[in-house]
Amino acid sequence: MSKFKVIEIKEDARPRDFEAFQLRLASPEKIKSWSYGEVKKPETINYRTLKPERDGLFCAKIFGPIRDYECLCGKYKKMRFKGVKCEKCGVEVANSKVRRSRMGHIELVTPVAHIWYVNSLPSRIGTLLGVKMKDLERVLYYEAYIVENPGDAFYDNESTKKVEYCDVLNEEQYQNLMQRYENSGFKARMGGEVVRDLLANLDLVALLNQLKEEMAATNSEAKKKTIIKRLKVVENFLNSNLNANADSDEAVPNRPEWMMITNLPVLPPDLRPLVALDGGKFAVSDVNDLYRRVINRNTRLKKLMELDAPEIIIRNEKRMLQEAVDALFDNGRRANAVKGANKRPLKSLSEIIKGKQGRFRQNLLGKRVDFSGRSVIVVGPKLRMDQCGLPKKMALELFKPHLLAKLEEKGYATTVKQAKKMIENKTNEVWECLEEVVKGHPVMLNRAPTLHKLSIQAFHPVLVEGKAIQLHPLVCAAFNADFDGDQMAVHVPLSQEAIAECKVLMLSSMNILLPASGKSVTVPSQDMVLGIYYLSLEKAGAKGSHKICTGIDEVMMALESKCLDIHASIQTMVDGRKITTTAGRLIIKSILPDFVPENSWNKVLKKKDIAALVDYVYKQGGLEITASFLDRLKNLGFEYATKAGISISIADIIVPNDKQKAIDEAKKQVREIQNSYNLGLITSGERYNKIIDIWKSTNNVLSKEMMKLVEKDKEGFNSIYMMADSGARGSAAQISQLAAMRGLMTKPDGSIIETPIISNFREGLNVLEYFISTHGARKGLADTALKTANAGYLTRKLIDVAQNVKITIEDCGTHEGVEINEITADSSIIETLEERILGRVLAEDVIDPITNSVLFAEGTLMDEEKAKILGESGIKSVNIRTPITCKAKKGICAKCYGINLGEGKLVKPGEAVGIISAQSIGEPGTQLTLRTFHSGGTASTDLQDRQVSAQKEGFIRFYNLKTYKNKEGKNIVANRRNAAILLVEPKIKTPFKGVINIENIHEDVIVSIKNKKQEVKYILRKYDLAKPNELAGVSGSIDGKLYLPYQSGMQVEENESIVEVIKEGWNVPNRIPFASEILVEDGEPVVQNIKAGEKGTLKFYILKGDGLDRVKNVKKGDIVKEKGFFVVIADENDREAKRHYIPRESKIEFNDSEKIDDANTIIASAPKKERKVIAEWDAYNNTIIAEIDGVVSFEDIEAGYSADEQIDEATGKRSLVINEYLPSGVRPTLVIAGKGDKAVRYQLEPKTVIFVHDGDKIAQADILAKTPKAAAKSKDITGGLPRVSELFEARKPKNAAVIAEIDGVVRFDKPLRSKERIIIQAEDGTSAEYLIDKSKHIQVRDGEFIHAGEKLTDGVVSSHDVLKILGEKALHYYLISEIQQVYRGQGVVISDKHIEVIVSQMLRQVKVVDSGHTKFIEGDLVSRRKFREENERIIRMGGEPAIAEPVLLGVTRAAIGSDSVISAASFQETTKVLTEASIAGKFDYLEDLKENVILGRMIPVGTGLYGEQNLKLKEQE
């Protein structure tokens, strides 16, 4: 039935290759068939003759000869006797290598349990028999009896409690039952034998059916869980032969009794060697000791059985045998570990394979490599980009075989021996041949730690004297190397394919871009930057200024003859235009390729400009041009850095003159603050923050002063200023530490010490200041060490989860995508849309919002130019293809991945993108911070925390917004959620008065206006409309989306706007809190000064329907009266360059058709001031306002009990303040009784100040109380590396928020067991119920409408909830923006696609909800691929497919849950993985990287993807 044949591995006939790998339980017969004889004695070797003992653990008769083709007694000693068995010593003459593969066995007198199947959770034997693990252990270790046949036995005398099959009894119960029921068939035993018999008697098929019936019958969740556990084990046993051939002995499924061992296999002796040390001692592998204990106990037990010893002694011996076998398989798993002679636990078989020092990670995944060497590196500034200096001594060793061949080929030596001698004597011929051998033979250099693919690159070696490897300066950044003693390893590629790959793919001149971000990594740094910066500076009045030179040759002559200064400003011709530049910049121009435009080089070149230059050259010119350009740049940089002769002198450090004055002023302010604190006017927190603010601003003022001085010094040629300004070394902050003041320092916990360091390094620090600065600095060093380990572990987990992701096909053909927009955090942009879209493929057409034409069609690959056009077009969100939505069967398709950032081209099939992604995320891990940030407990007073104001122009729309009018006549927000204020511009206006109708058809929305005479229809894309949950601020973003202000059936006037584009939105409560004051009216225009933005001719238009009509009679000074007024700036070809909406009340500043020459000209101006404030609120307090008119009453509010009375000194008013710590069960509440039986309750938080009295009459919108915001305790924000690993591990947060799962109206039910009950009722009648702990703060109100995904309580949103409620795309958005916030915050650029690849792997498993007719059980986690294949199989057979829901697994869980056994076992929890796999007879089809590396096969990526097909090379025409 299967396509696989089992390969019998014989020692001489090893298969060259195999297709799959299966793990199974071995039957006793199987073990016997492997064995070459029984090991009877515990002896190892005879210590006198040093020959192995017969029948012992190293016996030559069982395991094979010690020396090649030579029997033990020496009778047969030649190759020709191969296969002969010696009569005298019984040894077969063979190669001694067979001692690595021949196994023996030990026949155990009594069956013992394999500890993996007893103790590894869940216990497999226990689960099958339905016995608890603890009870099973008691039976196996002869402490309890297990019922084999219950007969008619009952536990009690009334015969009510029947004794069941497999019940576990203690000694007392057993004796009691034996007395009463021995004759009626009752039988119970203890030990391994009875367990083996019970397992052998199991009828698995009957058990399976019985369990399935029980499953259908039960309703209890707990019971279901235990049944499912058993079901899984039973199914695994039954399915363990699915892929075997029917005729082979593999066709028998695994049997449960095979988990008990009767024949114990013995490992081949060369795998547990015994090595003689000098001094007559022996080093022994621990396994030998463990085997010896098993053999000793087994023989003793045999003897005791023959002697018919008392039961108790035999039992004890059997128990000891069980313990000895346990220790052999997994020492220390159960009882205390067995210790050797030197008091350390012996290493058992399990320990040999697991962990960092185990077989998998130490010997199979990381091997030592032949033809390699390592040495210290030094800089090689004269090398070309693709060269490295290789010491002659190293080359001699590394290329020895090649060299020997070369010497013979050239006839210098006739024999190998002679050639070797020549090499030893290092004759001249040897060096000559070495040069030839090395030429054209690249070598690979590697610097540990190898964090990404650029840590191994190939170079052409250049032979150098000395013992150090020379490295090109520009590749240092990629290797993260410096020359303070770093070492690097050299590897020689041997095969022709390997050499070709080195030359084509790995040469350093090919690896110019970082695979993480697509930025160039070979950018000049330090000295080179300094040299180029120096060269590009301009000096006023330098020698030879304002001369006219024809070109570079003339400039060079003038420089040499000293009649022209390098910084002099000169005039010259470039590309037929006269330009002003400097002599130095012309020199730079001379090394640039011709296509570089003038504005890229004719300026002061700092590090960023040089990086941009390199990027530009690469994008325009390609690899070869860039590589040679970089070399010229490096030479120029070094040359002029030397000529500049920049050095640091104490005279360069200039201390500001009025430093003392500024410091005295600051000290005075600090004293004042301290006094007001002593008087009790401010709190200690305020005092601390204010003092820190004073010192920060003082420091900033001084730094600015100092920078001004340094900049003016020597006309900008101050050495220290040049270093910092060019970006070569140092920063403004460091200079200010040298020259202004050192500033504020941090404590090890990250908080700021309030006494600053006033001195700078030029003046020197005093003792106290020195002590303060060491305080935080040492913490920094300790952090770095810890960080490296954490970052390394994160990388390892990521690699493991993503190693099987590769590009398999060109296009999977999906139309699905994920909508992306710019990532923002607190109104600062973290990643722009332009950056996010770069190198991706569109999943939907992009429509130009201005012309409504298709800007880019679906399937377009967005390169830099297109991304730029898109960024400028004002589009706010785009749908792109991502690895998460890719439909490829295996791996990912090229289109869903996009550009391979390391090359800048569309990725090719065979690229191992998973590993690249994991490296890209892990490599900068060491640059992230470790600490969690403490935010202080004070409310900040930034403007954005008190109000929101409009940044763009348009008019206001209220979405669902309700307001109250208070006594002062102000509008107060009455909504707590699901409302927003939008700033919009019109897109479609009604051509006539009529009734609006809106209908959804598939992907389109049709808006129509109809009256008795006529009807018009407008078609919109559904995808462009803002969804209700986006408007409410629950998910997604609304910028640039469309908004429909009217509902179907409404009457609309002529010229009314019915479709609008949202330009900005402020939702309640995220951007506008409840009870804020609204300062705008619905429909009110928001006017700003509008700048042209482009040069060109002005043309005015008015919106009619969905098109623009030209308006020509517009004059300067006109005021716009009508909605829908637009201005277009047309360029010289009369194409639209820019379009602006001009709101009503704007004043026009130009006539129609006037020309604009400056893009910053204001075309239309605001009559009053710009930046209209939309809403304001109290920055320090959360206000509680009355929602109805009525009478206040207090509940649980009592002065002196739950509240304190406070008297305001200034006004003499009394108010109550709720205590911070309340007695349990006390819940202070304000109740307003309104008309009828209407009542509203407000539960008050601690520290709330109450402004009303019991029994007061109040009106709607009156302020009842205020809760100070600072009372919200300061939260620790997890940041940096811990945050990243928290997200990738998908940990459930400690204080997770409860999240609504459906849209609906909130109802509070009566509390249950001191928990609040919230019920959400949806429109369609469904409801969801939540029980919420009293400790949580509930954020919703009775009767509010809430969207799925909104928080019901405070806390952190868990990514599992995001997936469950909002789906995969929302999770995609959430995870990427959270992770990017950490990396971008540290200034690290990583492309989104890398995070997406990892997220797609975290989502690679699904949870079966309904199993249908498939072989799955509900609750199973299976990989999507297995799930899909199984469903396809069932559907073909006409059955009911399974249904599953996506689950999010952390990277560790996802890696262990890999479809490949070998890969999972080599990652973590080795024993558990192997246990499961062996019972289920799992197959590993060797499809991914890791398992192939372990087995030493070609890995299936890159050229290995086509390993089967023969590649043909063809010459290029």
UniProtKB/Swiss-Prot annotation:
Ion transport as a keyword of this entry, yes or no, is no
Q: What's this chain's function?
A: DNA-dependent RNA polymerase catalyzes the transcription of DNA into RNA using the four ribonucleoside triphosphates as substrates.
**What's the protein called, per UniProt?**
DNA-directed RNA polymerase subunit beta'
Q: How does it assemble?
A: The RNAP catalytic core consists of 2 alpha, 1 beta, 1 beta' and 1 omega subunit. When a sigma factor is associated with the core the holoenzyme is formed, which can initiate transcription.
Residues involved in Zn(2+) 1 binding? 71, 73, 86, 89
Gene behind this protein:
rpoC
Residues bound to Mg(2+): 482, 484, 486
> In the record's cofactor note, how is the cofactor described as bound?
Binds 1 Mg(2+) ion per subunit. Binds 2 Zn(2+) ions per subunit.
